[in-house]
């Protein structure tokens, strides 16, 4: 990411979009730390005197999406399965997995939900996220059948219900993810192509 931001001034419209998104962050000196343990499905563990449940729900936002549930406290940490007050973005998908993840959260019935982005929330925020993806899936499928590109679909689908959510340009990435699911593609979408589409969607006029 640091290299991309450094090259952004030479990348035209895409570079300008990168700088708007990431220019205020300092990525220098960040080192990737690999996990010491992994799991799949579900795992229980203790942290101090608290029992935690780890629940795999990806791929959706990313391949490794995981919920962390503290059942005794009725608190759930969603990671980036929940963006409170902003459009989510399905980098890995499929969108149907994200909908299933929302259903899993609702079945756990937590009192407090700590999202990956935004303030602490309640289950109403999860229901709204689920409704967003269900609506988007249906609308995108119609336009996919009509032969529209993801960008054309993004420009034609109304998301007025979520007008107060930020980062509306992410819509095109979510639509591209639905298209990939409908076409049977299993690899994550190309990030550079996705950023270019977001930049185009955000372009005035």
Model-derived regions, located:
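Short N-terminal secondary-structure initiator segments
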Residues: 9-26, 59-65, 71-73, 77, ...
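Charge-patterned, long linear interaction tracts outside catalytic cores
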Residues: 37-38, 43-50, 55-59, 63-64, ...
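Metallo-beta-lactamase
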Residues: 1-142
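Short flexible/disordered coil segments
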Residues: 25-35, 39, 114-118, 171-191
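Sec/Tat-exported extracytoplasmic proteins
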Residues: 5-8, 109, 140, 144-148, ...
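Glycine-rich, flexible loop/turn motifs
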Residues: 35, 41, 83-85, 161
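C-terminal regulatory/interaction regions
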Residues: 146-205
């Amino acid at each position: 990411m640091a290299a991309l931001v450094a090259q952004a001034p030479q990348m035209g419209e895409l570079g300008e979009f990168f700088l708007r998104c990431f220019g205020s962050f300092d990525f220098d000196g960040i080192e990737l730390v690999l996990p010491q343990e992994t799991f799949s499905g579900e795992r229980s563990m203790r942290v101090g005197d608290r029992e935690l449940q780890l629940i795999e729900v990806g791929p959706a936002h990313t391949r490794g999406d995981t919920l962390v549930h503290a059942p005794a406290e009725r608190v759930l940490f969603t990671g980036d399965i929940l963006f409170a007050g902003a459009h989510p973005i399905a980098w890995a998908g499929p969108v149907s997995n994200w909908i299933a993840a929302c259903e899993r959260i609702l079945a756990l019935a937590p009192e407090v939900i700590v999202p990956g982005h935004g303030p602490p929330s309640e289950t109403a925020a999860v229901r709204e996220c689920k409704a967003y993806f269900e609506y988007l899936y249906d609308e995108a499928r119609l336009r996919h059948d009509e032969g529209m590109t993801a960008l054309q679909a993004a420009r034609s689908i109304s998301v007025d219900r979520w007008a107060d959510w930020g980062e509306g340009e992410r819509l095109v990435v979510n639509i591209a993810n639905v298209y990939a699911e409908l076409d049977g593609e299993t690899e994550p979408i190309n990030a550079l192509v996705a950023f270019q589409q977001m930049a185009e969607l955000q372009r005035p006029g």
